[in-house]
């Protein structure tokens, strides 16, 4: 079954914020973790991920900084901000309410 694009799009910011709540990460790591943790159901390509990260940074949900390591090219690492943490808490609450409603109405199994 393919996952609806709009559902994926609507959850992307929440997924990114949740991963950054754990620790700072760079874009490629974020994309790979989303793919791994979703067992390949959710994938984000650079063409869509990086513009989203830039928009989230402009809205002060996350903060980026360049990190350089000897012998490697520099990478932009992102961290969640206080605003991002508040938004994540609100989104989690909203998703929980939404999922509970789907379970009740459509008879879905919720892990």
Where are these regions (language model features)?
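N-terminal helix-turn-helix DNA-binding core of bacterial DNA-binding proteins
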Residues: 4-48
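Beta-hairpin "wing" of winged helix-turn-helix
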Residues: 57-74, 79
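Amphipathic alpha-helical dimerization/coiled-coil segments
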Residues: 85-111
């Amino acid at each position: 079954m393919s996952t609806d694009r709009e559902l994926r799009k609507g959850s992307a910011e929440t997924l990114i914020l949740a991963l950054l709540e754990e620790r700072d990460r760079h874009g490629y790591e974020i994309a790979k973790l989303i793919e791994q943790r979703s067992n390949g159901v959710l994938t984000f390509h650079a063409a869509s991920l990086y513009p989203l990260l830039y928009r989230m940074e402009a809205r002060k949900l996350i903060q980026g900084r360049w990190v350089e390591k000897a012998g490697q090219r520099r990478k932009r690492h992102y961290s969640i901000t206080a605003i991002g943490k508040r938004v994540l808490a609100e989104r989690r609450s909203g998703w929980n309410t939404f999922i509970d409603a789907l379970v009740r109405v459509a008879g879905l199994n919720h892990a």
